[in-house]
Amino acid sequence: ATKGVMIDVMVNGQFSYYATPFLDEKYILDCIDIAVNNAQLASKFSVFKFDHDEVRKGYEGSYKTNLKSPLSNLSVNDIKDLAFIGSKNMMNFDKRIIHAATTVELIERNTRIVSTNGADIDQKMDIVLVELSSTAQDKNDSQTRSNHGMRGHCFQAGAEFIEDYDIETEAKQISHQAIELLEADQCPTEVCDLVLAPDQMMLQIHESVGHPLELDRILGDERNFAGSSFVNLEDFGTLKYGSELMNIVFDLSLIHI
């Protein structure tokens, strides 16, 4: 288990955060000082001032995954056998399949969030993740197909998910689709409508507007590492980019239809 304290402050309508894994009073007080100082500095460039009475309300509640059987009922061999069946069926589907990978991940996460504003939220989540990926190659062309991309096949469930999962059928389908991609004609060079599957749509939004809206990139702090951004500070609240159906806001209380 991991422990820590996150200090959340608001100064002049500006939020700031700082955290420490050390629970000694000295480190907690240092966190407060740093968070307050950062909020004061950031408030000079604030694009939106929050109202203290409208945010960080003291909610209470509990949640746990609805499951039939705990994940602890599964042994290491159960997981190993499942991964082996997945990769074996993908590799054996066609001689043009040159690579197959199966990832099985089980997560038991217990989180309790207690805040000085009265919040007390207890969450117990059991998560099952199964990733299948198959790569087909013919001469100089190769194509990869997966079951909805990285972490695209992720569920809140118990051991019953693994016990009922027909990985053999899905593995063969993944390799079949990889072969279909390999045999498909090249896309024509023309202007046309593009339909994105959910995994590609998430990645498209993530790369095209997600990273550019990161303040460290906008301010130039990441220029020598991950890159900069085409967004400027003066663009906040005015820049229109992309479809009207897509909107990204920091205020999660706003409702968009």
Language model features by range: what are they?
Residues 1-255:
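Active-site bordering "gate/hinge" segments
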